[in-house]
Amino acid sequence: MPADTLIGEEGRTLNKLYTLITNNELVKERYGAYGKELNVEYLEDAGCLDVLIKARDAIHGGSRLETHPMAGSIKPNQNPYKTVMISDGKVDPEEFQEFITVMENSIMTCRKFLMEKPLPEWEEKLKKDFRYIDQSLIESAVSRI
């Protein structure tokens, strides 16, 4: 599955509720008041791993994974910001298993990279660039809802 595409986009309907789970305040500011079909769940002071775990837990609760959590081929120990889109769309058992597998693999990959080389304390200018990169990765998915 391509990392930058919506998952199951052929099954989307206009009345779905989408949620961005993010630790990126730039995403919160940009999409926080986007409209009634899009919510932002902002995890302040959270890391990438926290975002992935929150998204996985939401999928266990019945949410649909709409974007690949490792989009952009950016290693988890390179960018401290992460945004994942989920929705309340219908999930069949095969999709559920696929979504959980994607999330568990992403969590394992994130843990592996962070254990090998923890995130450095980036200066604010670099953090700003990383926030922008993360936001740009989610823009194409948001533009399709």
Regions found by a protein language model. Name each.
Residues 15-19:
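Extreme N-terminal starter segment of soluble prokaryotic enzymes
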Residues 22-28:
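Short, polar loop motifs at secondary-structure junctions
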Residues 28-34, 43-61, 68, 82, ...:
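Rossmann-fold NAD(P)-binding glycine/threonine-rich loop
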Residues 57, 63, 87-145:
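Internal alpha-helical scaffold of NAD(P)-dependent oxidoreductase catalytic cores
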Residues 70-74:
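Short, solvent-exposed loop/turn elements at beta->coil junctions and helix N-caps
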Residues 77-81:
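A short, glycine/Asx- and small/polar-enriched loop/turn
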